[in-house]
Amino acid sequence: MRTTLAVCVAAVGMFLSAGPAVAHHAFTAEFDAKKPIKMTGTVTKFEWTNPHAWFYLDVKDDSGTVTNWGFEMNSPNMLLRNGWTRNSLKVGDVITVEAFGARDGSHIGNAKSVTTSTGQQLLAAPNQGQ
């Protein structure tokens, strides 16, 4: 009887913990595939961390106002498979990013690809929202 109870408690615990794990990785919860954005800016920070790498860009609009944007990417392991390294971006690099914008209109996006000033294109999230 104790074994059955322990198995039931463990199973319920697994089911209850699965929801938050899936929600954390839900692209559509935070980003909108119908809001593609493309912008060029200067890298201010590059975080090569799990579970998702991030980079930040200073982007100047037509009036000269600079806004800092953050872009989420896949995990470093997935990025390595697409040709990235922890040194692919450096503070001061000028890059162009294609991404999907945030649902709430904040200055973040889910990066799809990055093009460096030399013309090299790196895929950041080939399976997201496409």
Please give the residue ranges for each predicted region:
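Positively charged n-region of N-terminal signal peptides that target proteins for export
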Residues: 1-7
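Bacterial N-terminal signal peptides
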Residues: 7-18
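Sec/Tat signal peptide C-region and signal peptidase I cleavage site
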Residues: 19-23
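Conserved hydrophobic positions within beta-strands
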Residues: 41-43
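Short aromatic-glycine-enriched beta-strand elements
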Residues: 49-60
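Short, structured beta-strand/loop micro-motifs enriched in basic residues and often containing a Trp
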Residues: 73-81
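Short nucleic-acid-contacting surface segments enriched for D/E, G, S/T with interspersed K/R
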Residues: 81-96
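OB-fold/S1-family single-stranded nucleic acid-binding modules
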Residues: 102-126
